[in-house]
Amino acid sequence: MPEANVVVVGAGAAGLSLAHRLAESVPGLRTPSVVLVDAPPGPLRPPPRTWCYWTAEPGRFDAAVRAEWQRLRVRPRTGAPVEGNTGPLRYRMIRSDDFERLVSHDLARSPTVRRLEATVEAVEDVPGGAHVRLRDAHGRTRVLSARWVFDSRPPGSLPAARTTLLQHFHGWFVRTARPVFDPAAVELMDFRTPQPAHGLSFGYVLPTSPCEALVEYTEFSAHPLTPDGYEAAVRHYADDVLRLGERQVLARETGVITMTDAPVPRQTGASVFRIGAAGGATRPATGYTFAGLQRQTRAVADALRRGRHPAPPAAHSLRSRLMDAVLLRALDSGRVDGPELFSRLFARVPMARLLRFLDGDTRPHEDLSIGLRTPVGPMLRSALELPRLPRRPFDLPTAPATGHLPPTETA
């Protein structure tokens, strides 16, 4: 007999979300037994991160929302900024440590969810289920059996793709000596940053008060920067573009998100599935993941409760993924100017509609209307050449250290 109906591997956003949904008792439906396996402290455990998403409805993780906004601002390289109201949508920010505290509090009260701290060495199919091979902090090994396994760990390699770019970023949590931020608006894309020879870059500001914000430098390109390169880029944006003046750096956050048109497998065995970013929850053209993984885990939890096959659904529609493939190709080939494209879209499309489009929540005629506001010729050429392009492997870079808390820096 399996030790659990479900084993969830990894306690990041996807793993915690699925465990949280399965811990809830629903009258008339099954409540599966769950083992959540979290990596021990060290390099395998995700560092603190910031997640953003948008929604008009209340959600199960609202208590973890650190801040929310209904105004977004996009700044082209020159000229006036584009600003709009996102109503009824709200752009929300969650810090992973707040999210983990909320979920852990609820899981601790669940009689059907058990947590283990161990390194997962292998996940393998067996007749009627799967085995998870574990090693604990003392070096002891054991095998955990389950009917279903949901693995949220990052894959060791990516499937071959026609186009792969990296969205890589480095940010400072800053506190300024004087009020310089507008806490009512997010600086979503500020293209006044130096543009790389290949790809695009922009600044990103999430203000939580007039004197505090997360200030990030972001690139869409083929290669990450060095740690010194990231520090220089954020310092230039904070000091020379935003002109923050006297400031303290309270913490730093670094990350790399893969933007690819590769088909990401969501099932790796008869009883083994991938969820979250590992299961294709990341929107290829934007890097946003949180909303997609919530759609996946909601569907998986519902299937398990009803005794159905719990294969995670695609987090994004085929239509959305095809449009993303065209955009990635157009950016990677240099046919379109990234800052000009995004500035033009935000200037010509209502903010709320564009956010719904970026989350795959628009109808075909709305997608067509938005597509006609892009450079049609270059986008059409990119679409026509895609079927002829070979798929090539992509070597994942070694990500820089992320989410560390350095000594406070004053400038």
How would you label these PLM feature ranges?
Residues 1-35:
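N-terminal Rossmann-like FAD-binding beta1-loop-alpha1 element of flavoenzymes
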Residues 7-9, 37, 143-155, 272-273, ...:
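Short hydrophobic core segments
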Residues 20, 24, 105, 207, ...:
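Short, well-ordered alpha-helices that flank and scaffold nucleotide-derived cofactor binding pockets
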Residues 21, 109-247, 260-263:
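Predominantly flavin-linked oxidoreductase catalytic cores and closely associated redox partners
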Residues 21-79, 98, 170:
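N-terminal FAD cofactor-binding segment of flavoenzymes
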Residues 53-118, 122-128:
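A conserved beta-strand/loop capping segment in the N-terminal third of enzymes
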Residues 194-197, 221-300, 308:
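FAD/FMN-dependent oxidoreductases across multiple families
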Residues 298-411:
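C-terminal helical "tail/cap" subdomain of flavin- and related membrane-associated enzymes
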